[in-house]
Swiss-Prot record:
Residues 33-63, 283-342 are annotated as: Disordered. One of its GO terms (cellular component) is extracellular region. The cascade of activation of extracellular proteases proceeds from the metalloprotease aureolysin (aur), through SspA to SspB. It holds the Pfam family Trypsin_2. Residues 1-29 form the signal peptide. The record marks N68, V69 as: Cleavage. Residues 289-330 are annotated as: 13 X 3 AA repeats of P-[DN]-N. One of its GO terms (biological process) is proteolysis. The keyword Protease applies. This is Glutamyl endopeptidase. Residues 30-68 form a propeptide. Sequence repeats lie at residues 289-291, 292-294, 295-297, 298-300, 301-303, 304-306, 307-309, 310-312, 316-318, 319-321, 322-324, 325-327, 328-330. Its EC number is 3.4.21.19. It comes from Staphylococcus aureus (strain Mu50 / ATCC 700699).
Amino acid sequence: MKGKFLKVSSLFVATLTTATLVSSPAANALSSKAMDNHPQQTQSSKQQTPKIKKGGNLKPLEQREHANVILPNNDRHQITDTTNGHYAPVTYIQVEAPTGTFIASGVVVGKDTLLTNKHVVDATHGDPHALKAFPSAINQDNYPNGGFTAEQITKYSGEGDLAIVKFSPNEQNKHIGEVVKPATMSNNAETQVNQNITVTGYPGDKPVATMWESKGKITYLKGEAMQYDLSTTGGNSGSPVFNEKNEVIGIHWGGVPNEFNGAVFINENVRNFLKQNIEDIHFANDDQPNNPDNPDNPNNPDNPNNPDNPNNPDEPNNPDNPNNPDNPDNGDNNNSDNPDAA
């Protein structure tokens, strides 16, 4: 599979720059060129509830090449209880462009942020307000957590098809990550080939704004590239890939017909990018004692209990340590190293 992936990857990179979302229940899609990696931002403000375009109003466009990859393992089922558990942060996306309204998927990962694909945000043509998000959507008549309007877009600085979207609060001054609990990200330390996974999102070949889950296994994993044997269609772009712990291990981007579907794997490089740009993103190991980033970890240099932390009262170099020869309160008044010694 490794050789085959390398062979097809350059082909698919080319298609990503010219292809993206679905714009109708029939899974039609938009073409758009890639944009730069700088954030697209508009003035932050509370937004009115976005207007929802229903299936009959969505304009069909030309079919995107490789948007639909239905494999022999076509184990897809509808999720009707969308507001509970790890399904709640899965989000239905609409992008209103000059050539039509297009649909995609995403996942809420912070108080005001979600993750999706670069090729999804490219459809905004530089106007973040064109992107609307409806977390936990049940169908085109039922959006239990309302809608949110994007205010800023930041694309992943690497090659992976990944983007961060920041949203304004809604009319009730609620943030998107307050109406749903943001997803937990996996540290992916134990992720490997043959593990069971699911991709959950809003495929365009199903009734508009209905959530579907597809089950399968990882077939390839290297760097930021992950492939799997489950089925998806246009509209699944930006869907989260969950492991068996319901942690996000990747963001789905598309696939190659009769071959595989793929995602941006959340490896160390991607994880660092996300942490740098999303202050409150939560990875599964963040609160573990052995996580070096955990402030409670005694090995964290910022932890006052770290013996190497100069602020640790037991640290010999701590000026407040009475055993420090430079401390005026050092009981050894005859210590020649103490400038205040008697």
